[in-house]
C-alpha cells in the first residue's frame, strides 16, 4: 500500500509507533523494517524513543536527503514536537493542560497534523510549505492537548470543530 500510494504521487505518512511487545523487544528488527519502508514514505513521525532507529536526531537531515523524505516530525511528549522540513528545523511547545489520560495523545497529534495538511489543500508533497507545516503542527498540538484531557483512546479524540473552536478563540 505504501509503495502504491507513493508511486501514485500521494502523500505517504508513516508513524513508527514502536511497541516492545509487538516486536518481542527486538528494536533492531523494527529498525530494519522501518529502513525498508522509508523509500516509500514522504512524511515520517518518530518519537524520542524511536529516533535512534533512524540514526539519531543528529542525522535526520542526512536521512531526509538519502530517503527523499519531505518532512520528519519528532514528537517529544508533553514538551511538544520538532519538525524538520526544507533544510530547516523548528519546535512547537507542548500545550500546558491538565492531563487525565495520555492514551492516544500521539495518534491525536498525528491525525490532527495530517488532517490539517489535507484541509489546507496539500495533495502532493510539492504543495507543502513552511506556513502549512506550522499550521499543521499547531492543529496537531491542539488535538493532542484536547485528547489527554479525557479518558480513553478513541473516545478522547477531539472533533474538527473542537480544534477549530480553540484556533478561532486564540486568534482573537
Region spans (language model):
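Conserved beta-alpha-beta core of the PfkB/ribokinase-like small-molecule kinase fold
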Residues: 1-62, 79-80
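Conserved phosphate-binding/catalytic region of the ribokinase-like
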Residues: 3-7, 56-172
